[in-house]
Amino acid sequence: LGSSPQVPWEATSAPSGTGPTRASETQVQDSSDPRPVVRGVKIQTGFPQPELLDLPWSTPLAEWPDDVLVAYPRGISRHVVRFAQVGDRVLAAKETTARNAAREYDLLRRLRQLGTPGVVPVAVVTERHTAGGDELPAVLLTEHMNFSLPYRVLFSEHPDAVIANKLVDALALLLVQLHLAGFYWGDVSLSNTLFLRDAGRFAACLVDAETGEIHPQLTKGQRSYDLELARTNVAGELMDLLAGFEDDSHDGPPLDPSMKSGEKTRYEPAAATSALPQIMSSNPVPVDPFATSERIVESYENLWNELTGEEKFPHEQKWRVAERVKRLNDLGFDVEEASLDTDDDGFVHLVPRVVEPGHHSRHLHNITGMVARENQARRILTDIAQFGRALYPGLPEDLTGSLWMQEVYAKIMAAVPADLRAKREPAEIIHEVLEHRWFLSERLREDIPTAQAVEDYVESQLRTRPDEQMML
């Protein structure tokens, strides 16, 4: 979307052969006419796409036919949510009230304009009715993010403390970015977030903005409340997760009799949470929910203080200005504006006022045209620098980046079979190949050519992994 506002586009659908019928109007059925009563629907969207009119809006979302749906999403939600194929895109559809749908749509649009990580709002669908005339909930449509993963998918085999720590670090960074933009979330949780792989770490993206508010600037109380919600919700979600794994390990019938044979046992969050003390007393727990939830508070506060805190130093230590900027760059932020004041005692007061995330991503894009997340970009920039020093010393960085794209990037991607490219994004594949090359070189105590590293990576690593491009 960029920073340009979307112009809402409204459409009303009507049954074929009846002419243009407004969504607020009904077709009155004559007593002698056997045809059923059909009602219109109102669609407000910034993406005028005629395929939206073909979705079964007169059917409750929970009853949409399989030929429309891509997959049933896993996870816990207070709303009915389904994924539908619309043209060449996959959209997430969520039933809610008309007021909440319109409000969340507007919030997501404004967050996109502010540059914060969030799903793309596509449309609000209102004035839905069944063929019999019964009113149906409104629907909010958002675009599914390719390669995004719900947190439960990342724990599909077993709980892992390293993954848990990386997830809460990503959530802390997302919360800082949202708060800097003036967004009060009101429902911070792992469940309301999608995660994308980012060079061995994760990047977090807001999915549910239903309870959010945008202000010119958040108060300390608003930020603290969001952070406390994050701490509480993360602990609860991890406890539910651990209890679910314990339930899965038991022999016997599944807890939910409606489940098909061979599916993993489902569980209710409240029941799972209440079972946790027994689990923790009888088995070692690889993830400590309470320590992990405290980590998000620590990560958030450290990052917030580094990005916004005042630094005071003597006038003769002016080098500390450049040092502070470099620290922020290393964290992935550019300083767009700062206050640099002196007092009567000769001390300098430095306060960053406007910081912009994406320092390494922008730098990489400028010299290569490549799109990558922050940690992916950081890793690739390191390889470009090493590539330049080894083969083209003294060459300008933009030319080095162009040569790296031809001699490294293009050759790596050409060596990855097309049928395996849905398993990881290109930037993540590049990162993993570079890491694999280093691992092989360390193990064999010799430099391994990139071509050999790619071949080994494809067969020993990538081929066995699930496709994550459209994992729901």
List each model region and its residues.
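Juxta-kinase regulatory segment immediately upstream of eukaryotic protein kinase catalytic domains
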Residues: 28-69
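Conserved ATP-binding subdomain of kinase catalytic cores across diverse folds
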Residues: 52-153, 158-161, 165, 170-185, ...
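C-lobe/activation-segment region of protein kinase-like
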Residues: 202-308, 312
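Phosphate/pyrophosphate-binding loops and the adjoining catalytic core of nucleotide-dependent enzymes
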Residues: 261-431, 469
